């Protein structure tokens, strides 16, 4: 008998009681698709190996495999996880957690019509950035603002609007690459402008910019090196110095600030990060930054600056392609409104709350976590509380660390650590941590909810 004839038909699988149950639970179409894929795999296996795929030895095995694949297919992939990596703004885990106010505003915008492009006072159409622009001007001192879907888009829009077919002067030490091999020179190429590099990797002087300026120069650009740091024999030009030079030639200065802090983090005992207000005070015409990093809101690219320049950005065709939807704008507005009460910011802005949690509070959480872990793990594992260092993440202050506390897990038995990591990731709400010095580190600095974590551990 041919091996191919041993493969069950889709109809035969569907007519079994188990097949009928699966069709009722997952839907007829989904079950048929999985059956078809599995049978095709069986044919390929026979063709290549000249034997039957093990799951086709018995129809009950086949149906069990179909159910497993249906469960895997139906599982939500962008699922909630516990961030115990010690990186608060973890790009791979979604960066900033939204505040309660931002979540509420976003949910309201999802379920209701909102005055997105409608002026309630005038009773007519308005611009969707209008309300947020007013807030940003109030917070930064700038004349106007423009909102797009991320900071790379903000840089692209600025370049395409003001520098297409022209030259942009930038220091070699600021030709950054962010995640995914995404580079400033690549953005410039897409915007249709010519990159003019000045200075060297570690030293750039004001005279380097001066010598590069010509009749085809569109503007001078500064990029905040937020995701790396050059130390030692270095020299760079400040925005204030660059603005003074640019004004001699009637040129603008534009700054990609990256993380985009709106408050001085040093007042909270955190590493100093340049603020948007500082750059505006230095005379920079356009400043771009992210919404989902130190700002603590949704992903967005924010541009603040002089009204005449912002108006041109708003009318560029790319702006419509890059604009944000009502949910993001609602979340961003609610986030920015928290900054109007700076004395309460560390309580209500989730990102700042996580960054400023006292070490004593983290130690209390660590004791709770250690206690639960000791009840769930075998004696093959050692569980200890250890001082740790966390980082902000998302390219913010790469050399700076923040004191933290971690629960560490170690074992002398081969393969046990890897097995536990797999168990952590297989939990209903996976635990994402780090491995360092042959130990699992569960760093509590970036954890949003200790009670939720403890409930998850109980399912280990």
Curated annotation (Swiss-Prot):
List this protein's GO terms for biological process: conversion of seryl-tRNAsec to selenocys-tRNAsec; selenocysteine incorporation
Q: Gene3D superfamilies annotated for this entry?
A: 3.90.1150.180, Type I PLP-dependent aspartate aminotransferase-like (Major domain)
Catalytic activities: L-seryl-tRNA(Sec) + selenophosphate + H(+) = L-selenocysteinyl-tRNA(Sec) + phosphate
Which GO MF terms are attached to this record?
L-seryl-tRNA(Sec) selenium transferase activity
> Might you report a single GO cellular component term?
cytoplasm
Coiled-coil ranges from the UniProt annotation: none
Q: What is its EC number?
A: 2.9.1.1
Tell me the pathway.
Aminoacyl-tRNA biosynthesis; selenocysteinyl-tRNA(Sec) biosynthesis; selenocysteinyl-tRNA(Sec) from L-seryl-tRNA(Sec) (bacterial route): step 1/1
Supply the Pfam families for this chain.
Answer: Se-cys_synth_N (PF12390), SelA (PF03841)
Q: Which cofactor does it need?
A: pyridoxal 5'-phosphate
Broad EC category: transferase
Q: Which NCBIfam families does the UniProt entry name for this protein?
A: selA (TIGR00474)
What is this protein for, i.e. what is its function? Answer: Converts seryl-tRNA(Sec) to selenocysteinyl-tRNA(Sec) required for selenoprotein biosynthesis.
What protein family is recorded? Belongs to the SelA family.
Name of the protein in its database record: L-seryl-tRNA(Sec) selenium transferase
